């Protein structure tokens, strides 16, 4: 919103200068983008009148004039403007005047004729107006007066970048109201009295779309002079607000829009067939707009029509056929309230952006129409003449906006602002803003004024109180907080440590959406019904995830489609399990998941390129588990999972509890997701592995270690991990490690059995072990294995 400071000061007179006014407006939340003078810097330019005007003897395009500037002598001035004529009141730069650009006026001769000054155009005075020829001032302007004073050019134009919620400030009226509140200054509005009617003509008005147009006013004015000149004071006010003067009737409707905040439109009455109909457009209905372009309308567009055709896009743009021209004598003046929801976005749909659409789509005061109609009528009769008919009004009270009544609690006000504002100040601020305020036991209730439809909740009122009171008036006060050290147990395993480990092992961390496609998720977790979002981003993101695998599998597919031969990803995040007994009916669990696909390593000339398998991922997961627990705390047990291959799946068991799964993706799942080749993945509950064994210092033995290898024959169904665990449990304090280094099946081993080669390392911190010590420990291990698993020592 660009406005003239002098126009604003006609309404309200704060005791501050231009710079202070701009700063004050900005601090109140209406950011000032620019403050610019309305004209260039010049001196010595006076009002004059052309009393003689003749042709230059030696130049066809020059005229020799005598100018009266209210002094004893007339000035001889040569002028080349085409509109220079006898009796014209002009702006005269006298000898010694300085024009913008430090251009000094001196006595001169033009083709031999003396010239003692210059008749100025708008551009020569640094005034941004598109016009040909010299500036024409109103007849009767005081001769010799300073043009800066006559045109009130000691003024600035202030451009304010309004936020979407402050549509009430798209007018001088609204800005004056705001400045008045900030400065506790009275606002003087122009007197708007009902214009006396002299004829009874009326146009019938039918509103078919009352929800989109709850109020529509129309008035006939006959015998207007459409060729009347717009007075320079109105042209200047429009110009300083960024609007170009067109003709008197259009200028008056624009003037009322800027002054009151109510867009209006004038129709040529002779071009309206049978009355006005406010309706929705028919699909692909055509309308030629004022700019000459043809619009093909959508059926969600509100139009002003007559009985046969559309006349205008309501609140946005008029039609060419019903537009006012210089030949127009009778008009119908429109003033309406259009609901923002039915205007918003429509202008952009047709590639339009108008001052009218900007105001209507953000919201116009729904009580303003009658006053705006009388104001426009008043100006039309004054400037263009005419005979006025009564206003025809059609309203749908049920569809008009209602005032919002909002509760404001003292505790909430103090809490959000961090400062106690006296109750009398709070009531005064809200009252000056136009709210109807009532006290309650906990604070106040405030009913918003008709022009502040953005005040809807308690926080809106708090914002208003804070900004009018002045944020600078709220003292700086550092928050007081107890600095308590967070409890951090040494046994807690940081997630960052696990992330770093996986990154070091060649993984990339993925972050996928918590919302997944329901059918895909059902393939992975068919036994649980997920939480379905009522308003999802899309149908493909409508279910809360039950597993991190859905997102990771899709990420692998995405990378494989982009020719990535090797994919290694991990993710940590929440899964969401519906559970009636949980808070909000949902249990949230932190999970850690990983997935690998493609080649085992980067392509290398000296290393064979192999595809990843189950044990590659198992080794990486074991490295993670070794960070969090000792070797005896976790194990892998053969299991089944609907998303994993039946013969290549293991449950992850920690301290006897099943906390996750690892395995190769099920072939059917692989096909439906579109995976390219073997893919292995794991998922484990983070809470089950987020503790670690606290390291204990141990003496480093100076005595030699002894290794003994044993080969154990056991049933195929017995897990090798169980046998290794039994070795460690029964080996006593001398056994420092037990590692499986070979598995053999074949000749010499019965069918249905396997031979496990295990390396046992024995060492003492006190002495060198004797053979008897070693033999005794090994025999105890073999005996324990034989007793528990019916396994034997291989010959």
Swiss-Prot record:
GO function term, MF aspect, one: phenylalanine-tRNA ligase activity
Cofactor-binding details, from the entry: Binds 2 magnesium ions per tetramer.
Domain B5: 401-476
GO CC terms of this entry: phenylalanine-tRNA ligase complex
InterPro entries: aa-tRNA-synth_II/BPL/LPL (IPR045864), B3/B4_tRNA-bd (IPR005146), DNA-bd_dom_put_sf (IPR009061), Fdx_antiC-bd (IPR005121), Fdx_antiC-bd_sf (IPR036690), NA-bd_OB-fold (IPR012340), Phe-tRNA-ligase_IIc_bsu (IPR045060), Phe-tRNA-ligase_IIc_bsu_bact (IPR004532)
Any coiled-coil regions, as ranges: none
Positions of Mg(2+) binding: 454, 460, 463-464
Reactions listed under catalytic activity: tRNA(Phe) + L-phenylalanine + ATP = L-phenylalanyl-tRNA(Phe) + AMP + diphosphate + H(+)
Compartment(s) where it occurs, according to its Swiss-Prot or TrEMBL record: Cytoplasm
Keyword Metal-binding tagged: yes
EC number, as in UniProt: 6.1.1.20
Keywords noted in UniProt: Aminoacyl-tRNA synthetase, ATP-binding, Cytoplasm, Ligase, Magnesium, Metal-binding, Nucleotide-binding, Protein biosynthesis, RNA-binding, tRNA-binding
Ranges of residues in domain tRNA-binding: 39-148
CDD domains: PheRS_beta_core, tRNA_bind_bactPheRS
Reported cofactor(s): Mg(2+)
Subunit organization: Tetramer of two alpha and two beta subunits.
Similarity-based family: Belongs to the phenylalanyl-tRNA synthetase beta subunit family. Type 1 subfamily.
PANTHER family, per database record: PHENYLALANINE--TRNA LIGASE BETA SUBUNIT (PTHR10947:SF0), PHENYLALANYL-TRNA SYNTHETASE BETA CHAIN AND LEUCINE-RICH REPEAT-CONTAINING PROTEIN 47 (PTHR10947)
NCBIfam families: pheT_bact (TIGR00472), YtpR (NF045760)
Name the UniProt record assigns to this protein: Phenylalanine--tRNA ligase beta subunit
Lineage: Bacteria, Pseudomonadati, Pseudomonadota, Gammaproteobacteria, Vibrionales
Gene that encodes it: pheT
């Amino acid at each position: 919103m660009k406005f003239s400071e002098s126009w604003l000061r006609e309404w309200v007179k704060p005791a501050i200068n231009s710079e202070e006014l701009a700063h004050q407006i900005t601090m109140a939340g209406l950011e000032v983008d620019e403050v610019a003078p309305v004209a260039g810097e010049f001196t010595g330019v006076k009002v004059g009148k052309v009393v003689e005007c003749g042709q230059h003897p030696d130049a066809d395009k020059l005229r020799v004039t005598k100018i009266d500037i209210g002094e004893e002598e007339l000035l001889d001035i040569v002028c080349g403007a085409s509109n220079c004529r006898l009796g014209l009141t002009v702006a005269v730069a006298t000898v010694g005047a300085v024009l913008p650009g430090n251009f000094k006026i001196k006595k001169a001769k033009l083709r031999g004729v003396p010239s003692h000054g210059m008749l100025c155009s708008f551009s020569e005075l640094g005034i941004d107006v598109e016009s040909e020829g010299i500036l024409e001032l109103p007849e009767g302007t005081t001769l010799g007066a300073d043009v800066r004073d006559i045109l009130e050019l000691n003024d600035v134009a202030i451009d304010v970048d309004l936020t979407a919620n402050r549509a009430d400030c798209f007018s001088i009226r609204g800005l004056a109201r705001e400045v008045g509140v900030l400065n506790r200054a009275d606002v003087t509005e122009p007197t708007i009295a009902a214009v006396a009617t002299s004829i009874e003509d009326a146009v019938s008005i039918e509103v078919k779309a009352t929800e989109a147009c709850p109020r529509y006013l129309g008035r006939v004015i006959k015998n207007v002079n459409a060729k009347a000149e717009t007075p320079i004071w109105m042209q200047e006010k429009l110009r300083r607000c960024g609007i170009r003067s067109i003709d008197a009737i259009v200028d008056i409707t624009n003037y009322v829009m800027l002054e009151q905040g109510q867009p209006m439109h004038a129709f040529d009455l002779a071009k309206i067939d049978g009355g006005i109909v406010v309706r929705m457009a028919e699909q692909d209905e055509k309308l030629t707009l004022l700019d000459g372009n043809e619009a093909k309308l959508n059926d969600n567009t509100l139009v002003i029509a007559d009985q046969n055709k559309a006349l205008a896009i309501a609140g946005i743009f008029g039609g060419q056929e019903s537009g006012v021209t210089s030949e127009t004598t009778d008009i119908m003046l429109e003033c309406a309230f259009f609901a923002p929801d039915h205007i918003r976005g429509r202008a952009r749909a047709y590639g339009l952006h108008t001052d009218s659409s900007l105001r209507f789509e953000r919201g116009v005061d729904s009580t303003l129409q009658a006053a705006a109609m009388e104001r426009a009528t008043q100006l039309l009769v004054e400037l263009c003449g005419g005979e006025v008919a009564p206003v025809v009004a059609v309203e749908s009270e049920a569809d008009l906006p209602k005032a919002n009544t909002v509760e404001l609690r003292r505790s909430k006000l103090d809490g959000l602002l961090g400062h106690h504002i006296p109750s009398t100040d709070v009531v005064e601020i809200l009252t000056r803003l136009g709210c109807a305020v009532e006290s309650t036991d906990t604070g106040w209730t405030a009913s918003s004024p008709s022009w502040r439809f953005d005040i809807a909740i308690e926080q809106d009122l708090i914002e208003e109180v804070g900004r009018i009171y002045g944020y600078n008036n709220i003292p700086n006060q550092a928050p007081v907080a107890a600095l308590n050290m967070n409890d951090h147990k040494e046994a807690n395993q940081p997630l960052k440590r696990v992330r770093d480990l996986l990154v070091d092992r060649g993984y990339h961390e993925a972050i996928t959406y918590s919302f997944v496609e329901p059918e895909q998720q059902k393939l992975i977790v068919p036994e649980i019904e997920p939480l379905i979002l009522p308003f999802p981003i899309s149908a493909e993101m409508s279910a809360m995830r039950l597993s991190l695998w859905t997102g990771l599998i899709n990420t692998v597919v995405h990378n494989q489609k982009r020719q990535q031969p090797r994919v290694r990803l991990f993710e940590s995040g929440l899964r969401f399990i519906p559970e009636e007994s949980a808070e909000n009916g949902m249990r949230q669990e932190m999970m850690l998941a990983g997935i690998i696909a493609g080649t085992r390593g980067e392509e290398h000339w000296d290393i064979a390129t192999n595809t990843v398998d189950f044990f590659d991922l198992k080794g990486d997961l074991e490295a993670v588990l070794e960070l969090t627990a000792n070797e005896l705390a976790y194990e892998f047990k053969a299991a089944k999972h609907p998303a994993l291959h039946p013969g290549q799946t293991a449950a992850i068991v920690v301290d006897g509890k099943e906390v996750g799964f690892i395995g190769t993706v099920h072939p059917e799942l692989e096909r439906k997701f579109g995976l390219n080749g073997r893919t292995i993945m794991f998922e484990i509950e983070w809470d089950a592995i987020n503790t670690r064994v606290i390291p204990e210092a141990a003496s480093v033995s100076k005595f030699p270690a002894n290794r003994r290898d044993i080969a154990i024959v056991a049933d195929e169904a017995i897990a090798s991990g169980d046998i290794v665990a039994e070795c460690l449990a029964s080996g006593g304090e001398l056994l420092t490690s037990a590692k499986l280094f070979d598995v053999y099946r074949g000749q010499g081993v019965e069918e249905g059995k396997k031979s496990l080669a295990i390396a046992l390392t024995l060492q003492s911190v006190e002495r060198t072990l004797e053979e008897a010590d070693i033999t005794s420990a090994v025999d105890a291990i073999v005996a324990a294995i034989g007793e528990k698993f019916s396994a034997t020592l291989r010959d």
